Amino acid sequence: MLTFLIPTAKEMTIPKESHPHLLPQDSQAILKIMAAMTTEDLAKSYRIKEESAKKEQQRWQDMASQQSLAYPAYQLFNGLMYRHIKRDKLTTQEQAYLTQQVYITSSFYGIIPANHPIAEHRHDFHTRIKIEGQSLKSYWRPCYNQFAKEHPQVISLLSSEFDDVFSKDCKQLWISPKFMAEKEGQFKTHSTISKKARGAFLTACMENNCQTVDSLKSLVFAGFYYHPDLSTDHEFVYIKKEA
């Protein structure tokens, strides 16, 4: 069985379905620090304006006082990649695939199933805080490595931000898809192409119920197709021709 890892997103939209917010034990130490920060501290940590930091401060304090609602993560996050993932009108098989084989890597919650209930928050591995004297990446590394040991065949749709959260020896069987546009024999990639393609790729995997590495090679989605000559055992390259 394939396991997919996807990142979080800064952009969020409130879905209809809500739940009580139950915070994992490993996240409590982070919440304690974030909820105690001033708007000035948050502005520096996030590299945002103080006006925006006030909104984030309220979210953290609501969580600390257990007043936050929680929403299925894959529905709450609404960044470019998420908007290209099929999230509505799923078949029973697609819903099972999304909730049982897709996991979200978070610097606040750890690694969670795609439908895990989470609260509105802003947090990533660039957030400048220390947890028990450790960086966020060091703090989460044991948890992330344990997940990798339990799920050896991972299809990673993660950005470079996560490269050194996992130890290298945990990623021996990982495959990272790469998405490129071809025009007049020239190949190019950029974040917009990649984010849209990640969502479309995951949707195609769900719709085709891909369960083996070889099944990924036959996928055609949003104009992309597998390119064997550019691919390696650990990097599957998908090309889209541009006019």
Swiss-Prot record:
Name of the featured protein: UPF0246 protein SPy_2104/M5005_Spy1788
Its Gene Ontology biological processes? response to hydroperoxide
Q: From which source organism is this entry? A: Streptococcus pyogenes serotype M1
The record's listing under PANTHER family reads: PEROXIDE STRESS RESISTANCE PROTEIN YAAA (PTHR30283:SF4), PEROXIDE STRESS RESPONSE PROTEIN YAAA (PTHR30283)
The entry assigns this protein to a family as follows:
Belongs to the UPF0246 family.
**Which Gene Ontology cellular-component terms appear in the entry?**
cytosol
User: Which Pfam families does the record match to this protein?
Assistant: H2O2_YaaD
